[in-house]
C-alpha cells in the first residue's frame, strides 16, 4: 500500500489552554507541515502579526468571503468571525503535508464531516477550571466580562471532548509537547477508508 495523501491534525481547546505555546513547542519537530492561518474579525492583540497569527479583516470583508465560498469552515466565537481558507489547505494536502488546524469545536465538527478520513483530532485542556481562569487573568488582554464569557464557553466545549480522538491535559508543556509529537506522527500514517477498502478487495488477488 503506497499512501502519499496529506493528513490533517486538528487542535482545539478553550482560550487559555495553551494551544499556541504547544504548537510553537512542536512545530519544528514534526516534519513537513502547513499551519493553517485562520481569518478573523477580532481585534489584533499586542504582539500579533497580520498574516502570521491570523489574517485580520473587517466583518464586511469576512461576510463577502462567505458569499464567495472562500472558507472550508467558519464560525462565530465571542461575537467574532473565524474561518479557514480552502485553497492553501488543498494545496498542502496535495503535496503530502500534515495540515495543522487550531480551530474550535464547531470547526472540528465541520472538518470531520468533510475530511474525516484523513483527520486526527486533539482536544487540549488545562488541568482545571480554576487554572484556566488564572491563565486568562494573567494574560491581561481581556476585560472581566470577556474572561467570564470565555469561561462559560470553555464549560460548553468541555462537554464535547468525546468527539475528539485524543485529549491532552496541558499542565506540563514539555510532557504535553511530547504527547503531541507522537500523535502528529500517527496522524501522518492514518489511512483513508477508501484505501483500506481497496486493499481488502485486492488482498486475495493473485
Swiss-Prot record:
Enzyme class: transferase
Protein name (Swiss-Prot/TrEMBL): Guanylate kinase
Organism of this sequence: Sulfurimonas denitrificans (strain ATCC 33889 / DSM 1251) (Thiomicrospira denitrificans (strain ATCC 33889 / DSM 1251))
Subcellular location: Cytoplasm
Pfam families (UniProt xref): Guanylate_kin
Domain Guanylate kinase-like: 6-185
This enzyme's EC code(s): 2.7.4.8
One GO CC annotation: cytosol
Function: Essential for recycling GMP and indirectly, cGMP.
Catalytic activity, reaction form: GMP + ATP = GDP + ADP
UniProt KW keywords: ATP-binding, Cytoplasm, Kinase, Nucleotide-binding, Transferase
UniProt GO MF annotations: ATP binding; guanylate kinase activity
Homology family: Belongs to the guanylate kinase family.
Binding positions for ATP per the UniProt entry: 13-20
InterPro entries membership: GK/Ca_channel_bsu, Guanylate_kin-like_dom, Guanylate_kinase, Guanylate_kinase_CS, P-loop_NTPase
Principal location: cytoplasm
Domain of life: Bacteria
PROSITE patterns on file: GUANYLATE_KINASE_1, GUANYLATE_KINASE_2
Amino acid at each position: 500500500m503506497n499512501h502519499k495523501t496529506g493528513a490533517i491534525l486538528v487542535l482545539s481547546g478553550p482560550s487559555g489552554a495553551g494551544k499556541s505555546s504547544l504548537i510553537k513547542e512542536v512545530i519544528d519537530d514534526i516534519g513537513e507541515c502547513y499551519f493553517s492561518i485562520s481569518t478573523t474579525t477580532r481585534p489584533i492583540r499586542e504582539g500579533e502579526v497580520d498574516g502570521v497569527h491570523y489574517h485580520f479583516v473587517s466583518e464586511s470583508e469576512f461576510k463577502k468571503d462567505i458569499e464567495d465560498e472562500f472558507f472550508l469552515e467558519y464560525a462565530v466565537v465571542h461575537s467574532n468571525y473565524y474561518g479557514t481558507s480552502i485553497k492553501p489547505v488543498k494545496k498542502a494536502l496535495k503535496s503530502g503535508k500534515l495540515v495543522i488546524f487550531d480551530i474550535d469545536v464547531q470547526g472540528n465538527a465541520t472538518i470531520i464531516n468533510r475530511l474525516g478520513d484523513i483527520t486526527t483530532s486533539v482536544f487540549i485542556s488545562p488541568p482545571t477550571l480554576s487554572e484556566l481562569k488564572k491563565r486568562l487573568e494573567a494574560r491581561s488582554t481581556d476585560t472581566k466580562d470577556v474572561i467570564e464569557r470565555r469561561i462559560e464557553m470553555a464549560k460548553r466545549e468541555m462537554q464535547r471532548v468525546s468527539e475528539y480522538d485524543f485529549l491532552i491535559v496541558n499542565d506540563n508543556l514539555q510532557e504535553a509537547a511530547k504527547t503531541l509529537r507522537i500523535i502528529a506522527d500517527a496522524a501522518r500514517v492514518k489511512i483513508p477508508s477508501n484505501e483500506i477498502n481497496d486493499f481488502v478487495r485486492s488482498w486475495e488477488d493473485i
